[in-house]
Curated annotation (Swiss-Prot):
It comes from the Bacteria. Keywords: Chaperone, Cytoplasm, Nickel insertion. This is Urease accessory protein UreD. One of its GO terms (cellular component) is cytoplasm. InterPro entries: UreD (IPR002669).
Length: 296
């Protein structure tokens, strides 16, 4: 039976650059909990986030607010896959179901670098979930996100049913002439879109990777980078496409394998590090079933 007292977990974090690398200040409220931070390559603060309740039901909310001060570096990930449980028809008070929501907001200062790489989201049958990602960064800031959603527990022959997944991504640049849109990406997938030929054509895994680069990419460089990313699709199953943004790139995955989605996105992650002459990323200790060492 659906709880009558939905959660509203919050996480407010500020990252600052220090002599020994980037550090964080702030904290979380239940059901969110911070795990032990580690120092990664280039002084990056690697911080896993745990959802102690095990998943979200209708009415639950998560609010994550991130601030990166000048020259700070952060990798924020999650300890496990996020589960969204069915809502429609589970409550006599709300028979049509209620939405679970997640809001992530990030403000980046000069020469800062944020990698937002949560583990996959699993949407159960009849679940309603809306996620919003809002990022503001300077011209020399870098932001990378990769999010994967599995629409229905396919191993149990489950589909979305009457459920629905919504996503709204907004990325803006601060320029000398004001704010400039880098990306506005709004998506909604219901069971019709999941099954439809002009939708996902019954492919239950969908993912998006976005990189807002810290510098303009010349035409030759971005074309070579996209060619390398397309080559990285070898031996992976699914439909994988990528393209350029005004100052960065976007990649999409649709298919049947969340593992292959993770592999491809992780290879792209390594490419973005390489493009900035940074050390190749190492797999966070909380990630399972991951390709190692990372290509390239």
């Amino acid at each position: 039976m659906q709880r009558l007292d939905p959660w509203h977990g919050t996480c407010n974090l500020q990252f600052v650059a220090g002599s020994s690398g980037s550090q964080f200040q702030g904290g979380c409220t239940a059901p969110l909990k911070l795990m032990r931070a580690e120092r990664g390559e280039n002084g990056r603060c690697e911080l896993p986030l745990l959802h102690t309740a095990g998943g979200l039901v209708g009415g639950d909310q998560l609010s994550i607010n991130l601030g990166l001060r000048p020259n700070s570096r952060c990798l924020l990930t999650s300890v496990a896959a996020q589960k969204i449980y069915g809502s429609i028809g589970r409550s006599q008070l709300h028979p049509l179901g209620t939405w679970a929501r997640q809001q992530v907001s990030a403000e980046l200062d000069a020469d800062s670098d944020l990698e937002w790489l949560p583990q996959e989201l699993v949407l159960y049958a009849d679940a309603l979930f809306e996620q919003n990602l809002s990022v503001t960064l300077p011209m020399d800031g870098s932001f990378l996100s990769a999010e994967i959603v599995r629409l229905g527990r396919t191993a149990a022959n489950e589909t979305l049913g009457q459920g629905c997944w919504r996503s709204d991504v907004q990325i803006q640049r601060q320029t000398s002439e004001g704010r400039r849109w880098e990306l506005v990406d709004r998506l909604e997938i219901s069971d019709d879109a999941l099954k439809g030929f002009h939708g996902l054509n019954q492919q239950p895994v969908f993912g998006t990777l976005v990189w807002a680069a810290p510098f303009p990419l010349q035409t030759t460089k971005i074309n070579n980078l996209l060619d390398d990313i397309r080559q990285d699709r070898k031996a992976l199953e699914g439909q994988m496409h990528c393209g350029a943004l005004p100052q960065g790139l976007i990649a999409r995955y649709s298919g049947f394998s969340s593992r292959d989605a993770r592999f491809w996105f992780s290879r792209i992650w390594a490419r973005t590090r390489q493009a900035r002459n940074l050390a190749s990323p190492k797999i966070p200790r909380v990630w399972p079933l991951q390709e190692y060492p990372l290509r390239p």
